[in-house]
Each structure stands twice: as structure tokens, then as C-alpha cells.
Amino acid sequence: MESPFSPVLPHGPGEDWESTLFAELGYFTDTDDVQFDAAHETYENNFDHLNFDLDLMPWESDIWSPSSHFCSDIKAEPQPLSPASSSCSVSSPRSTDSCSSTQHVPEELDLLSSSQSPLSLYGDSCHSPSSAEPLKEEKPVTGPGNKTEHGLTPKKKIQMSSKPSVQPKPLLLPAAPKTPANASVPAKTIIIQTLPALMPLAKQQSIISIQPAPTKGQTVLLSQPAVVQLQTPGVLPSAQPVLAVTGGATQLPNHVVNVVPAPVVNSPVNGKLCVTKPVLQSSTRSTGSDIAVLRRQQRMIKNRESACQSRKKKKEYMLGLEARLKAALSENEQLKKENGSLKRQLDQVVSENQRLKVPSPKRRAVCVMIVLAFIMLNYGPMSMLEQDSRRVKPSVSPANQRRHLLEFSAKEVKDTSDGDNQKNSYRYDHSVSNDKALMVLSEEPLLYIPPPPCQPLINTTESLRLNHELRGWVHRHEVERTKSRRMTNSQQKTRILQGALEQGSNSQLMAVQYTETTSISRNSGSELQVYYASPGSYQGFFDAIRRRGDTFYVVSFRRDHLLLPATTHNKTTRPKMSIVLPAININDNVINGQDYEVMMQIDCQVMDTRILHIKSSSVPPYLRDHQRNQTSTFFGSPPTATETTHVVSTLPESVQ
């Protein structure tokens, strides 16, 4: 239920509201003994018997007239307080006169005084005129300053007369229609405090309805007893309007209204108005609730600000995402275009490559013809003619212009040896050309034959010296063998031969003319037999040993050789080998043959080794018999004195 009350009570200049208000309230007596339960009291709103004709006082009567104050467009604003203000409508002194004795005020007013001027609160309501009820009013509590002014207020019985004492006219507010009190509506207590400048109201969500009063008079109707609590802050903190005026809404900011039941007791016997004691209530609870409400409002404001900021950030984030999406889409389109262009270029390159890979038939035919012409030039008749012409030229080779120390055969043998030398020289001259011209290229076959391995430079003088010594060694063995054979055949012939040797003692070598012999004496002594026979007789043996014309051969069928291995080996050079064989001294006067053995040492490098299988039929007959004897001697008994112990067969280069 809403309680109408006025925020401001104007006063006339020069009047002491405090003195007049509490002076009149001091006459109320017998208020301490009267208690009434407002919950069990019924009120009747019968305004037909009420007299609202007021004898208004001359001070500012036009301001408080209903025509000037209560209008549809009124706007209530908190203003600085006068020495006295009121939050409820109070009837004028004349209105109490016009009303019957049944009028009563079912409210309890708590007046809290301070060092400043207090606020006045009056409220009355009209009841049924059938019975006269005494008016019950509250006894104001004066502050410390008022106690010194008034002192003890005497209790006076208020006579229900038609002419009460004159009091200052308070502000009249139209009363709202009274509704029966419900148990669910809490009681309210209105606490009035004196303020220095403004009268702020406590923060509550209660609405005060103000309606225009009738023309004849003004009646204030409070739905429930209430005590208005006014706080001391000079500024009215407000967040929501609480004052509603009919016709035009004028609201006062937040206030706190605590309603407590205020019983009113009607005393028909003595006709006195019983006024209850004022209820004193501290403002600490309202202050705490105000702080809580203020904090709640601050939290609401912060929440709204944070929500606004979050919405703003979200909007900015969405705008950024949209911009990035647009940039990504544009970049994607650009990349698609570039990808398409690259694919087209790749297709063009692939097609061009395929066209270039397929050769035309004309080019293929030309290539085949060039290859055939090259083959014909290398293996054709022109190359053969050049080779034939070259075969005739080797006769001029310097290999044929060498000195022959001994010649034992006739002219035919010389021609045969010359032909063999020509063939061998041609073969090596063809493989390794002696031409040193810079711009002349030797003709080689199409199939490349790798040249022989690199050989160190050979001194020509040293080569000739070695060749001369080897040939002399072979021929000396031949001379010794021939001499021993003739001595066995005929002593006479031996003497002649020895005489001839003595005559030619000045020469170291001597040429011996001999004829072919079909058989050789098997009783020959220890000697080196040089084999001179016709090429056709022992051609099979030469083929078996793969004889080469530029190589000296030492053939032995004995098994009792002294072989000494090498103690060191150099991997970067060819293996070296020395052959030590019996030799004949050039001059018997140089070394005595009785105390020393004359041997020939041949140092050479091993070029190759291989195993040969020679047929026994190809071996010369005289070597075959020696082979049998030496084999049996090597595996059996030692040889006899009559058997040959050292037989070496030497095959010279010049004879085949």
C-alpha cells in the first residue's frame, strides 16, 4: 500500500515553526497509557460528513491552494529545506474544527530531532460520522537544542471543540483512497530527521501517489501507519523515481520507507485524542542498505560497461575476420589465375618436347649413311692399299741395319732371317709408330687396340751392349760345342782346328762353317749346345713354345736347378729375375778355368708366366734322350760320370 507524503513544507517568513509545532504537541496528554492494535481496527472511508472548509491563514495562502499546487503537469524536485518540512499531509486547524469528533489518525509518527530545525508530519483521516472517536497523535521527541528551549512539555487534554488553537498551516497533500490493510503488506515506519540543506529520502522502490484534493477541503489518507526515515546526506542520491503524481508523473529519487503498525485507540468516554509514544529507530540499517544498493548499482554499471566493451571488441573482431576473409578470397582468385596460366605453359612445353623427340625420317637416313661411310673409309680397299704399301717400306727399318757378329749359314739362310726380321719389325712398327711429326697421325684400325704399357726410356747404346753380350755368349757355346764334337770324331780334325785357333788368337770370335747333321753324338761332354737346324725340321717345337723373334730363349729339361727366391718385393715395379748359366771365357788367359767356374748371369724383368704343354714328338731327339736320363737321375740314383750333367739348349734369334 502506498503512503502519500509531501517532501517539502513551506513556511512563512518570520515564524518559528519549531516553537509553534512543539508547543501545540505539548498539550497532548494521556498518550502514554493508550495503546491500540491497528491490525484489529477497521477504518471506513466516508468523506460525505467531513467538512473540508478551512479558514486559511493569510501567509502564503495562494501558494498552497489546490488550484495552484496540484496540477496535471506538476514536477516535484528536491529543494533546500526550510526550518520545517513534512512528508505527510496534515490538516489545518480549521479542518479539525469542521470534522466531527469521530475523526482519528491511525498512524504513528516518529519525530527525530537534531540540532537543526525538525520536520513536521501531520496526517489525519476521516472515519465514519456515526461515532465520535478521539484523535490520537504522536508525541514528538525533541533534540538537545529543543530541550533547552521548551524544557518539560506539560501534558494537556485536548478538548474536541470546534475551535482548536491556531497552528501554522502545513502542506496539504491529497489523500489516496484507503484500502483495507492486508497481512501480506509489511508495516512501514516513517522516520523524520532534521537536515541542514536538503531532505534526501532513503532508497526504496515504494511509490507515492499524489492526487488532487476536493475543492472544499483537503484530506490526507495514509494506507498504513508509517514512519518516514530521513537521512542526513545533503545531496539526494537517486537512480529511480519514486514519486508519482496523477496527471503528470513527478518522482522523487530513492528513499527508504519502513512501515510499522501504529495502533490508534478511540476513547469515547473522555473524548481525548490518544497519542502514542514516538518510535525511535536508528538509521544504521538504512545506511547499510543504501551502501548495498549503491554497490549493486555500481556493479550493474560495470557489468554494462564490460558488456558494451565486449560487444565492441566482438564487433571489431568480426570486422577483422571479414577483412581477412576478403583478402584471402582475392588472393585465392589470383593464385587460381596464376595456376591456370602455369598449367597452360606446361602443356605447351610438354607438347613441344614430344614434337622434338620424334625424329624425322630424313634425319635418320642421313645419320645411317654417315656411319656407313665412316666404316667404309676405315675398312675399305683404300685402307688395305695403304697397309700393303706400308708392308713394303719396313725394309728400310733401322732394325735391319744392325751388325751380325757371326754368320754360319749361306745366303739363303741370310735371306730367310732377313724376311723374318722384316715381319717382326713391321708388326711392332705398325703398333707403335716412330713418326714424330706433330701434324701427322698414324693410321689405326677402327677397333681400338690399347697400346702396350708405358715403358721407361731405354738407352740405345746400353741396349746394343746387352744384345752384343747375349749373342756372344750364345755363339761361344756354339763354338765350344762344335770343337768338342770334332775332337771326338777325328783327332786330326781337332788338331787342325786347334792350330787354326792358335793362328787366330788375336780375334776373340771365330766363324765355323758346319753342315747339317742328322745325328749328334750322345757321348758329348758338358757343353752348351746351340741348335742350328732348318726351320722345317723343328717347327712344331717352336710353335709349342710360342717363339718370338726379339726374345732369347733358354730351354732346359733338367730338374736339378738351384732356385733362390727374392727377399724383398717392390709392388710398383715388375719382378726381377737373374739367370746364371755356364759360360765360356772369352780369353783363357784372363781366368784360370781350373780354380773357377765361368758363369753367365742374365738380369731381366718378368713380363709374363704361363704353363706350356709340349708334345714329346716335337722335342728334338738328342734333347729327348737327355730328358729321360735327367728325369731318372732326379728321382732316382745319381748320374754317372759318363752322363752329361749340364746340358743347356740355346735358340738364337737369327736361326729358325
From Swiss-Prot:
Keyword Cell cycle (UniProt): no
Site residues by UniProt (Cleavage): 406-407
This protein's UniProt keywords: Activator, DNA-binding, Endoplasmic reticulum, Glycoprotein, Golgi apparatus, Isopeptide bond, Membrane, Nucleus, Signal-anchor, Transcription, Transcription regulation, Transmembrane, Transmembrane helix, Ubl conjugation, Unfolded protein response
Domain of life: Eukaryota
UniProt cross-link Glycyl lysine isopeptide (Lys-Gly) (interchain with G-Cter in ubiquitin), position: 139
Residues covered by region (Transcription activation): 1-137
Positions of region (Disordered): 81-171, 632-656
Biased composition (Low complexity): 81-101, 111-121
Pfam families for this protein: bZIP_1
InterPro entries associated with the record: ATF_bZIP_TF, bZIP, bZIP_sf
Residue ranges, annotated region (Leucine-zipper): 335-342
Location of region: Interaction with THBS4: 455-575
Keyword Nucleotide-binding: no
Modification after translation (UniProt): During unfolded protein response, a fragment of approximately 50 kDa containing the cytoplasmic transcription factor domain is released by proteolysis. The cleavage seems to be performed sequentially by site-1 (MBTPS1, S1P) and site-2 (MBTPS2, S2P) proteases.
Entry remark concerning the domains of this protein: The basic domain functions as a nuclear localization signal.
Family: Belongs to the bZIP family. ATF subfamily.
Name by which UniProt lists this protein: Cyclic AMP-dependent transcription factor ATF-6 alpha
